[in-house]
């Protein structure tokens, strides 16, 4: 810090500090004079040749504006220097006010939101339930059957449509004899049992044959998204064109090769599937206990969050949702109108995330936790196993500093969870593979 800069601080609250900064006016005057001389070289004033305007005229016409520019520059150049000199962990941009020339100093006040100094409560009182699961033979068989279903084909079937069959049909809907928008389609495909349509629709088609026509009566749910249809009784004329049954692929060499199995047959596929499921269990269990631990800690720690921090988190979550939209609908995230996603939509989750970030940072600081590089290497290696060329992925995460920093942040957060679990009480509960993965999916959707 420049030795001629004077700074005093006044802590307004746990999340805000005010600095009074004094800069010697001589520093400003020197810069003002320098700029006036620069302006004089090119200034054009009637009655004088370019470069020959008297300095008194330059000061009279440009002096006030130049002085204000210099003051703004000096404030911009010194405010962060002042914040740093006081070891203040600022959040967001400082708010400058009360700027004045006083005696031999430029004096201004900078109000800045600060990272809250939270005394984390309840670390030794945490009680969480840690879910665990095992992969049995039936789970592996079910997963392989799901792999088959992902590549299922439908072949024509003679007879009535039953659960699992795919039906191709035309339909025409009406309410009180009047057609309505979106109520008709041709060559519509529906798998019986998929619950894709409103209640009663599939039941009306089940049992029909190709070439058969009939009218079914259904009632739109009260909470149906189209308000003009909610709770209304409707009639649909159905014309079935084709009934097909599912045909799963045989587990032969061609099928095995789809999953990278060239040797070892079905047993090798089962072994690969089991290992992948065990990785999923490990990740899901880790995610579950982390969520439970953080939830328990948040219940015991409520505090105000700096507005800038909350706004940053809201914007981060909004951008994440827009990215999901772009992936889902195949559009550029920039094409979505942000006004469709108001702050209120994210405030609750953003406040939780901001508080959690502060708590985690305080635990790291107070307990002196440092990232375990061996765990970082293990994390990268395990993540790379999911790719066709693990070595390429490992090299990417090893050489890209930003990506490695992201992983280090995740690993350090895991270390915080480990520390918290060691201080608290954990009870293990075994659940099924399906329940554990379903809970993880619900957790991710809520984020």
Curated annotation (Swiss-Prot):
Q: Which UniProt keywords apply?
A: Cell cycle, Cell division, Chaperone, Cytoplasm, Isomerase, Rotamase
What's its EC?
Answer: 5.2.1.8
The answer to keyword tRNA-binding applying to this record is no
Q: By its UniProt entry, which InterPro entries does this protein fall under? A: PPIase_dom_sf, PPIase_FKBP_dom, Trig_fac, Trigger_fac_C, Trigger_fac_C_sf, Trigger_fac_ribosome-bd_bac, Trigger_fac_ribosome-bd_sf, Trigger_fact/SurA_dom_sf
Q: Where in the cell is it found?
A: Cytoplasm
Q: Where is the PPIase FKBP-type domain?
A: 164-249
**Keyword hit for Hydrolase:** no
Gene Ontology molecular-function annotations: peptidyl-prolyl cis-trans isomerase activity; protein folding chaperone; ribosome binding
> Catalytic activity annotated for this protein?
[protein]-peptidylproline (omega=180) = [protein]-peptidylproline (omega=0)
Q: Which GO terms describe its cellular component?
A: cytoplasm
Q: Name one GO biological process term.
A: protein transport
Cite the Pfam families for this sequence.
FKBP_C, Trigger_C, Trigger_N
Q: What does this protein do?
A: Involved in protein export. Acts as a chaperone by maintaining the newly synthesized protein in an open conformation. Functions as a peptidyl-prolyl cis-trans isomerase.
Q: Which family does it belong to?
A: Belongs to the FKBP-type PPIase family. Tig subfamily.
Quote the record's domain comment.
Answer: Consists of 3 domains; the N-terminus binds the ribosome, the middle domain has PPIase activity, while the C-terminus has intrinsic chaperone activity on its own.
Q: What is this protein called?
A: Trigger factor
Q: What is the lineage of its organism?
A: Bacteria, Pseudomonadati, Pseudomonadota, Gammaproteobacteria, Moraxellales
């Amino acid at each position: 810090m420049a030795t001629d800069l004077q700074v005093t601080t006044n802590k307004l609250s746990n999340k805000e500090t005010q600095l009074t900064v004094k800069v010697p006016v001589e520093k400003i005057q020197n810069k003002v004079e320098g700029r006036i001389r620069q302006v004089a070289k090119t200034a054009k004033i009637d009655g004088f040749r370019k470069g020959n305007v008297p300095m008194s005229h330059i000061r009279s016409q440009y002096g006030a504006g130049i002085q204000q520019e210099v003051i703004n520059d000096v404030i911009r150049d010194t405010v962060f220097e002042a914040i740093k000199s006081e070891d203040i962990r600022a959040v967001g941009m400082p708010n400058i006010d009360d700027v004045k020339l006083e005696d031999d100093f430029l004096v201004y006040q900078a109000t800045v939101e600060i990272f809250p100094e939270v005394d984390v409560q309840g670390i030794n009182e945490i009680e969480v339930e840690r879910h665990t699961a095992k992969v049995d033979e039936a789970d592996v068989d079910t997963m392989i059957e799901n792999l088959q279903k992902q590549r299922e084909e439908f072949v024509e079937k003679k007879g009535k449509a039953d659960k699992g069959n795919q039906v191709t049909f035309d339909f025409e809907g009406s309410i009180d004899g009047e057609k309505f928008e979106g109520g008709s389609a041709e060559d519509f495909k529906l798998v019986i049992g998929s619950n894709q349509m409103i209640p009663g629709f599939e039941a009306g088609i089940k049992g029909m044959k190709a070439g058969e026509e009939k009218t079914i009566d259904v009632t739109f749910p009260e909470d149906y998204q189209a308000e003009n249809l909610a709770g209304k009784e409707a009639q649909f004329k159905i014309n079935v064109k084709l009934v097909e049954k599912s045909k799963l692929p045989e587990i032969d060499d061609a099928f095995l090769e789809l999953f990278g199995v060239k040797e070892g047959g079905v047993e090798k596929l089962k072994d690969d599937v089991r290992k992948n499921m065990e990785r999923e269990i490990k990740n899901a269990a880790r995610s579950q206990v982390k969520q439970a631990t953080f939830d328990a800690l948040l219940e015991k720690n409520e505090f105000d969050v700096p507005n800038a921090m909350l706004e940053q988190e809201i914007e981060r979550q909004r951008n994440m949702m827009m990215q999901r939209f772009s992936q889902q609908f195949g559009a550029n995230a920039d094409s979505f109108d942000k006004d469709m996603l108001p702050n209120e939509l994210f405030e609750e989750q953003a406040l939780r995330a901001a508080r959690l970030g502060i708590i985690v940072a305080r635990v790291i600081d107070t307990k002196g936790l440092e990232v375990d590089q061996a765990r970082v290497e293990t994390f990268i290696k395990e993540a790379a196993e999911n790719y066709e060329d693990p070595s390429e992925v490992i090299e990417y995460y090893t050489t890209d500093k930003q990506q490695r920093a992201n992983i280090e942040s995740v690993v350090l957060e895991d270390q915080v969870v480990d520390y918290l679990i060691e201080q608290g009480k954990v009870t293990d509960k075994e659940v099924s593979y399906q329940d554990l993965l379903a809970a993880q999916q619900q957790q991710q959707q809520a984020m």
